[in-house]
Amino acid sequence: MLSKLTVALCAAALVIPTAAEARLSRAETRMTQVVDAEQQRTVDMLATWVNQNSGTLNFAGVARVGEMLRAELAPLGFKVEMLDMTKAGRGNHLVARHKGNGRGKKLLLIGHLDTVFELDSPFQRWERNGNDGTGPGSGDDKGGMAVMVAALRAMQAAGTLKNADITVFLTGDEEDAGPVEISRAAFIEEGKRADVALDFEGLVQLDGRDMGSTARRSSGEWTLTVTAKSGHSSGIFTPGSGSGAIYEAARIIDTFRREVPEDKLTFNVGLIGGGATAELDAGKVRVNATGKTNIIAGTAIARGDLRALSQEQIARAQAKMQAIVAQPLNGAKATLEFLPDGYPPMAPTEGNRAILARLNGVNQDMGLPEMGELDPVKRGAGDISFVAADVDGLAGLGPASRGDHAPGETVDITSIFVQAKRAAILMSRLASERP
C-alpha cells in the first residue's frame, strides 16, 4: 500500500509545471495547449486550402481561397474585405481588421493566397505521409496562413486577442505581382499605420536550427539590348565590320561578372539570344532569333535579375553596370533597362533585430533554442519588403518546408504547430505593449 506521503508527492507531480511552462503566463500556456489540441483541425484546414488551386493567374481560385480565409477570420472578430485588383490584372487581396483596445502596438500580419502552380500544373492535390504534407502551396504560403490562423485561434481561446489591434493582409499575387503602383498601394498604406509587421512566409532552417529573418533582399529585372552592324562573317573584327552584337553582349555580361560583385549582391542572366535578328516575345520569357554561321550578329538580347540588401547597393550596382554598357566594342551599341516594378529590399535594421530578440525571449520561455539571424542571401524577396521602410518587421514566421515552387513541395507539419505557438505568444506580448 502506498504511504500518504507517496500519494501526496504523486499528486503534486501532476500539477507541477515543466520548466518551460513555469516561464509562460497562464494565458500563454493556454495558447500552447490550444494549438496542440487543434492539430488535426489545422491540418484538415490546410489540406482543404491546398486542394483548391490558386495559381496567381487563376483569379477565381484565388478568390475561393480568400473566402475560405474569410470563414476562418470572421468568427474571430475580424472585419474582412476583398480588394479588387482588376486594374492590376491580378486576383483580389484579402484584408481583415481586428479592433482591440487601441492601447497596444498595431500588428500587420502578412501572407499570400496565391501559389506558383497554375491550373495546367500536374501538381494539384494534398497528400500526407506522416509528418510530411505534400501539395501545391503546402509551404508557400498556405502553410504560412495555417500558422497564422492557428495562432489567432489560440489567442482568442486564451483571451489575448480581444484587446489586440491586428490587420491581416493576404495578397493575391505575391508569386507574380501586378504593377506595384496598383497592386501594392493599399498594402504600403497599411504598413504606415502599423507598429510591427510579421511575415508568415516560410521558416528557414540551417543544419537543423530554426533561423530568424530580419532582412530580405530586393528583386528587380533588367534587359540588355545590343545592336551592331550585320554583314558577312569574313569581315568580323575588322574596323569596317566590327565585332557584332553577340560578342558585345558577351563582353558586357562577362564584365558584369568580374567587376560588379560585392557582398550580399547577386545578378543572374536568365535568358539570352542573338543573331541576324532577335526579339523578345510579349511575355519576355523567350527570345526569337534567326541567324547563320556566316552572318555577323546584328542583335542580341539578355534578361536577368538583380538582388541587393539596400537601395544604396542597388544604385551602386546599376551605376557600375551602366558604365560597362557605355564602353562598347567597335560598331556596337547597347542599352540597359532596369524595370521599375521590382521588390524593394528589407534591410536588417536594429528595429527588426529587436523583434527577433523578442521572439528569442519567447523561445527561451518555451524551452526552445535561440534563433540566429539568417543571412538574407539564403532567402528570396517577399511582400514585407514593400512596408520595410515604414515599419519594423520580422520574416519567416511560417512553417519549414522543402521543394518550394516545384512539384513535390512539402511542408514539415510539426513545424506548423511550433511556429503557431511562437507566433501566438509573440503577438500577444507585442499587442499588449505601448507603441
Regions picked out by a protein language model, each given a short descriptive name:
Residues 23-28, 221-223, 229-435:
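Metal-dependent amide/peptide-bond hydrolase catalytic core
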Residues 109, 129-179, 220-226, 235-259, ...:
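Alpha-helical metal-binding/catalytic segments enriched in His/Glu/Asp
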Residues 118-128, 215-218, 282-287:
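Short, flexible, mixed-charge acidic loops at enzyme active sites
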Residues 141-215, 274-284, 435:
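Acidic/histidine-rich catalytic neighborhood of metal-dependent amide-processing enzymes
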